[in-house]
Each structure stands twice: as structure tokens, then as C-alpha cells.
Amino acid sequence: MAAIRKYQYRFLARIVVEAAAPLNIGSGNKGIKSDSLIVRDVNGLPFIPGTTLAGLLRHSLSQEEQETLMGSQASGSSLVITEAKILDAGGTPVDGLAQPENLNSNLLSRYVELPIRQHVRIGHRGAAVRHGKFDEEIVLKGTRFCFEIEFVADDKGQESKIKKLLSNLLSNTFRIGSGSRSGFGQIDVVSCKYRMLDLANDKERELYLAKSSSLSQEWEGFVDDILEELKTLKPTSEAWVEYQLRLTPDDFFFFGSGYGNDAADMTYVRESYVAWNGNVATIKEKDEVLLVPASSVKGALSHRLAFHYNRLVGNTIESLQERGLTPEDVTGKNNPAVKALFGSEGEKSARGGEMIGKQRGNVLLSDVMELRATQPKLLNHVSIDRFTGGAIDGALFTEQVAYGGQQELPVITLFVRSDALQDEDIRQAWESALEDICKGMLPLGGGVNRGHGVFKGSLTKNGQLLYGE
């Protein structure tokens, strides 16, 4: 008769993460105000489901590690992962039914009405693509969440496995939620309290049994914060190439919010975020914040990438006509470089609604948000009737743009999977598109045909200067 295995060891970790960029933890539901609503708990506050965390952590492991830690068809998982609950202004997780005075606090009350980010997909003709307009609800940058992981083992020597799993959270390319290729999902690990228990020891067994399942209650058993140790185990980013853009605006730039206000018909996007001083949170109001949406940078790069790739491989109007092709066949998702780096939503199959040929993007970048008071400027516009010389009825509008003041933007970091750049034409086209931004030849944002969004700067690749000073 086979001996009974005793799983007497428990490895417990309590992790606090902070949203380094806005998060989009989708519920799969639509609402009156947004096409995509975030998931909320019983208190109406954002949270991260345990299944989301389990899937992300599983994806970060090798196949062998997945079967060891998270089970397979032949064995169950050795990991127990809780939901990640939001922290209040005092740094305490809100788990269970919250008191009304806590929900009405200056911090948690901000999560009743969250920002809605507007998106529109632009075609190669410079106009919106049909069905390409959508919006989504997002969680504020700086929001902190707390969750716990328990690893059950029969051998004390398996401690290295759980620590390696925890170190994956520190990877530069680890993202949570949807929109990871559009600027959302980047996190920072704030703390990682840890404890190993041997249940064969009476005192440690009693300590384990006394632990509450509520995240809002501190457990005296956590004695060590192993964050610094995990940093030494942090996985390398050899599979990714890191590019950095350091840009300074020439003058005005405009990343549209999709809304107007009392002063203008068109305004640039601004969002509040949460700032922490120790375990005390405060709200930085949107009027004080500079925001550069990563999706705006990504869209501009996608179009310029297609241009440079077609230039390098000789896709001209004449050559396309000779081959019986149209510009649509070498632009957008049909362009090999665009598909390799930014992915594709696929095509509908001949049988019906199923999408085939879907591919995830291989470029990671995050929204840039910094506490910096931008100078809004109102610009008035009017369209003139060429025959009468007077204003066209309904063609007078005002836009509110941001003035950069010749101050350098926060660094924009882009991670690209190295295997996506193996094709030399794709690599050259990609780096040429990035250089165009630094030269001021590829404006970013809206109103570029009116002179907005011109930036100058430098480009580095894995720390090595490619362009600029």
C-alpha cells in the first residue's frame, strides 16, 4: 500500500500591488455610460478576481512549473489565491461589507464614478474605421490592492518554487487586466509579507488556525517582508527589447477626451490619480496631472510602421496594381509588420461569426501620467465659405489644447518581443517610426493637421542611444 503523503508545510504570502498605470478589469458587461464596465465587489468597489490572478501567474510559468504548482488533469492545484481587494486611504484592505462612512471617504467615494477612456480606430485614410469607436471604464492609477497566496507542500525544499512565482510579479512586462497592449495594466509590488509554517509544530499549527480569511485583518504570523529578496530573483527580460523615448513638445499638443466643457467644444484628456505617502493615500486632481495615453502613441506608430515597411519592401501604387492588389491589402492588420508587432483581431470565418487568425500584439507600453500643471490654451476656429468670405453656419468651434512649455515629458518606455523583430525589414521599419517621432516628423495626438503634437527628443534601445543626444 502506498504511503500517504503529508502536506504539512504552508507557504503564505500577503502581497500589496499598486497600479502604475490605469487598470481595466472588465466585467464583460455594458452600461449606459460605457461599452465596457469594470468588475465591482459587494461594496461597489473595484477588485481583481482570484481567477484573473491565477491565470496571469500560470501564464508566467513554464509548462513544468505550471503542472507542479497549479496542477493538471491528474492532480489539483497546490496554490490558493484570494481576490485582490482595494485599500482604503489608511492602507487597510476593504474586505467584507464596509461601513458607510468608509465608503463615503474622499478616496473610496472616487470609485463610484470612474474615468471613461474614449477610443477610436483610425484607418489608413485618416478617418475613423466603421465600428471602430468604443470606450471603456478604468480604475485610477495609484490604486492599491491586497491579496494572499498560500502554497501547500509536503517538502520544505519547495520554498524556492513559491518565491520564484512571487518574483514574476516584479517583471517589467507583467500586466493585469485587459488593454495591456493599449497602456493599461502595469503594476508595482509595494510589499510582500511572507511566512513558512510547519503544521507538525504545535505552535505553528495554532498560529495557522488562528489566521482569519478576511484580508482586512492583519495576521501576526507575517514577520518578514521579502520584497528585496524577490528583486534578486526577478526574471530577466531577454525575450523583450526595451525602447525609451524622451520627448519635448514644440508647443501645443492635444490628446482628446471626447468631451467638451463650458469653455471649449473639444478638450484634452485629464484624469485624477492616487498618490501614496507611506500608507496614506491622497487624490491628485486631474487639473494637476499631465496624461499621454499610450493608445495615441500606439496608433500613430502603427500607421507609420506600415508606411516604412511598404517603403522598404517596395510596395508602391504601381507594384500593387501590377499584382492586382489595393492599398487595403498592405495597410492595417494586412500589413505584415503591423500584424507582427500590434497583432490582429482576425477575420470572420466563412461559416459565420467566429473570428479566425487572431493574434496578440507584441508591443507593451503604458500610459504616462505625471503631477505637472499643464497650461491650457483656448484656440478658436472657423471655416470660411470660399464664395462669400463669411463663416459657414455651424463651423465655428473652440478647442482646448495643452501647452508643453518646452518641458520634457516623462519617459515613454516600450517593450517589444525580440522574436517579433527578427525580420530585418520589420525591425528597420519599427525603429524608423520611432525616430520619426523624435525628429518631429510624426506628430502625436489630435489636431496634427493644425500643427499640434510635434515633439523632438531622443531614442534608446536597451540603454544604447539610437537617435538624438
Named regions from a protein language model:
Residues 1-469:
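Small/polar/charged residue-enriched interaction surfaces, especially the RNA/DNA-contacting tracks
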